[in-house]
C-alpha cells in the first residue's frame, strides 16, 4: 500500500502472492497433466475412495456399539419446583399458581410445572399447578394447604 493512501477498506489489497490461481489438472502433458498428480494405476488413480473407507479394516461406524432403547416422542417435560423453593418464595403462605411462579421468576412461561417434595414447608399453601409428586402433596396437606392439579 502506498504511503499517500489512507488505511481505508476500499484501499486494502491482498499481499502479493497471497492469492494464487487454482491449478487446472489433467490438461495436456505438462505439469499436473496426464496422470494429474494421482500416480499410475490403482484404485485411487481411477476413482475417488470414500473418506470413511479404511482399506478393508472394520470401519469405525461398525466397531462402535449400537444405541440401546429409544426416545419417547410423547414424553411430557416438566419444569421442577421443590417445596424449599416454594417456602422461600411464599414465606407468608398464600396461593401458588403457574402465573405467579412465572412472575416471581421461578419458572419460564409456556411450559408445564411440577412441584416435587424436596425440603420442608410450614405455611399453608393453595397450590394450583400442572402436576404434584406424592411426597409434595402429603407435605402440603399436612401443613394445612390444598393441592389442585391441572393435568
UniProtKB/Swiss-Prot annotation:
A Pfam short name: Ribosomal_L27A
Summary of subunit composition and partner proteins: Part of the 50S ribosomal subunit.
Gene3D superfamilies recorded: 3.100.10.10
Stretches the record annotates as Disordered: 1-60
Single GO molecular function: structural constituent of ribosome
NCBIfam families in alphabetical order: rplO_bact
InterPro entries for the chain: Ribosomal_uL15 (IPR030878), Ribosomal_uL15/eL18 (IPR021131), Ribosomal_uL15/eL18_sf (IPR036227), Ribosomal_uL15_bac-type (IPR005749), Ribosomal_uL15_CS (IPR001196)
SUPFAM superfamilies: Ribosomal proteins L15p and L18e
Role of this protein: Binds to the 23S rRNA.
Protein family (similarity comment): Belongs to the universal ribosomal protein uL15 family.
Gene Ontology CC entries for this record: cytosolic large ribosomal subunit
Protein name, per record: Large ribosomal subunit protein uL15
Source superkingdom: Bacteria
GO biological process: translation
Keywords: Ribonucleoprotein, Ribosomal protein, RNA-binding, rRNA-binding
